């Protein structure tokens, strides 16, 4: 992909979107679709913050140029031309990143890549809001991932051993206060995962981070973070795919397929199409479990008129 024209210095008013823009830069080559929507989120958020002062107008204008250039380069990519596909792409990507970090956390493997993955997952869930309101599940994952990143970072920075797995989340105000301090020191370059709890903030690199590895075939969390399947096995620098559990087919679905008297609204067809798109996106990641779940939702909706 051709290099994009650089942006001018970030105005102080846009501090809240600096990490989303960094994530966009990190994904320009790895996943241009993710990079595009990160910039779109930054653009929309920046417009709401300040679109009138000269420095902000100049910055937003250059950011718009980047968006137009990216859209032209991506051409007829369905994840750009169809919102349903784009939303599914981002959700799957963010949840897989969350799952990788959560599995490392549950196994007690605390390292910079895991912290970065938690925080980046939370940023990408922010980005999903360009498609509309977040689901309750995404809101929970975002809160948990952002808090975990800050909690583990602070523990390692202070020479403490973090508690593995789900722990009591602090009050929202505490999360907000610690978020910027923790995020500012997150790694921005690939580092080798380590099973050691030792951590030296002074060794944190400053280049662009591109090394988060997402395990193929891992399935996204089904419910809340506390219900993500536990990771097992010894600490290792090699990320192992999570074994997939294909959900059982609801027998009741087969009894309704032949009835043919269900009255479906245009909204029902749109939701069914959305579930099928989600399933297709999940299969791109070899995520059979999520694909089956979404296909079952579509089938139930089309045969019963209910979700």
Swiss-Prot record:
It is found in: Cytoplasm; Endosome membrane. It holds the Pfam family Vta1. GO terms for cellular component: cytosol; endosome membrane; extracellular exosome; intracellular membrane-bounded organelle; multivesicular body; nucleoplasm. Residues 179-233 are annotated as: Disordered. Its main location: cytoplasm. Residues 2-75 are annotated as: Interaction with CHMP5. Keywords: Acetylation, Cytoplasm, Endosome, Membrane, Protein transport, Transport. The keyword Cytoplasm applies. It is a peripheral membrane protein. Involved in the endosomal multivesicular bodies (MVB) pathway. MVBs contain intraluminal vesicles (ILVs) that are generated by invagination and scission from the limiting membrane of the endosome and mostly are delivered to lysosomes enabling degradation of membrane proteins, such as stimulated growth factor receptors, lysosomal enzymes and lipids. Thought to be a cofactor of VPS4A/B, which catalyzes disassembles membrane-associated ESCRT-III assemblies. Involved in the sorting and down-regulation of EGFR. Involved in HIV-1 budding. Belongs to the VTA1 family. This is Vacuolar protein sorting-associated protein VTA1 homolog.
